[in-house]
Amino acid sequence: MDIQPHDSFFKQIFSDPKRVKLLLDIFAKDIGQDIHSIKPVNTEKFSSKSQKFMLDLLFSCKVEDQDAYIRIVLEHKSYLDKELPIQLLYYNAAIWEETIKEKEYYPPIINIVFYHGKGDWNIPTSLPVVKNTKLEKYTSKLNYILIDLNKISDEDIISETHQDICMLWAILTMKHIFDSIES
């Protein structure tokens, strides 16, 4: 398996549940405060066809005091990947396939996509794009939180993450990873 240095760096920094909580508090303020009991989950998964694959990072957590079980998938992309929604759906299906063997429900999955590539992000964060409102209630949806580092100023990153210096430097490093290449 070919692992890029920035993949290892990203996983090392963001494998800490406290940092995942901070990410949610910053980038998903509307639900961040309701999430607790974040725990890392094994990222090795098998599809129904017994194909093995690895997720970037995966955590279980609870929302408020309910028994609801949410898993959080973090993906980071250094380039625009038009197939990302398909990949997220595939990962979600594999997680549900495994979970339903032990639980009697399909837990919600929060997908977080880190983007620090060179181009503008132009993939909708809610898919499919449905123009007919009657059709909308019959259509499966995929939503994900996009953290587009190109759209966040260094000052905002510093002010939001100053309480965790490792996270601050990790995000700034990911944001500026291509700067020296361009210069």
Please place each PLM-identified region on the residue numbering.
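Elongated, amphipathic alpha-helical interaction scaffolds
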Residues: M1-S183
